[in-house]
């Protein structure tokens, strides 16, 4: 394996491990019941989460974003999770935003360095539109599936250009392998799909 591919695989493994830890942490927070707040697009909670993160560490940068509650067809979810990394402290902190407030703010006790997402990424609604146009709609209609998760990160699922920031949308259906759709977060184009 070449040095570049080995480095990519190592970084991808670290990012995926952090994403799993982040998801498990947020899964422990109860989901909204009756009176669920209105959903909002991923970018709508970014300013609040970024302000909180930069009060925690002035060099904090967004490295990962994921829906914490169901996301609808327009790209809105009642709660989104934002993970920040501070290079100076070599620590991560997660913020879960719902209804214009921070619901969770906790350090992630895992050591890893992850690249920040690039500026100018498309919002969750545009990512869904691209994924649905390419493969998501067909999967939903043919397999009775639904969009269960979407996450924004850099360098985990694009082996050709690993420094790109991408949205990864995961569609699930009963008794079927999941469908993964990777959307370039700058161009809004599908870069890759696979079942697994």
State what each model feature region is.
Residues 2-5, 23-196:
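Long, terminal "pre-/pro-" and other extracytoplasmic accessory regions
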């Amino acid at each position: 394996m070449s040095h570049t591919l080995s480095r990519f695989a190592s970084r991808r493994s670290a990012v995926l491990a952090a994403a799993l830890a982040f998801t498990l942490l947020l899964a422990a927070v109860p989901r909204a019941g009756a009176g669920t707040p209105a959903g909002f697009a991923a970018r709508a909670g970014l300013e609040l989460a970024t302000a909180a993160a930069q009060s925690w560490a002035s060099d904090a940068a967004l490295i990962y974003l994921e829906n914490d509650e169901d996301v609808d067809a327009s790209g809105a979810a009642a709660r989104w999770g934002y993970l920040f990394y501070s290079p100076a402290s070599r620590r991560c902190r997660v913020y879960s935003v719902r209804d214009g407030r921070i619901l969770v703010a906790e350090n992630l006790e895992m050591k890893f360095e992850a690249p920040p997402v690039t500026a100018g990424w498309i919002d969750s609604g545009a990512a869904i539109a691209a994924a649905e146009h390419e493969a998501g709609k067909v999967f939903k209609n043919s397999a009775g599936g639904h969009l269960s998760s979407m996450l924004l990160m850099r360098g985990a699922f694009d082996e050709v250009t690993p420094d790109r920031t991408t949205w990864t949308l995961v569609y699930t259906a009963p008794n079927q392998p999941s469908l993964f759709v990777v959307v370039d977060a700058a161009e809004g184009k599908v870069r890759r799909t696979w079942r697994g």
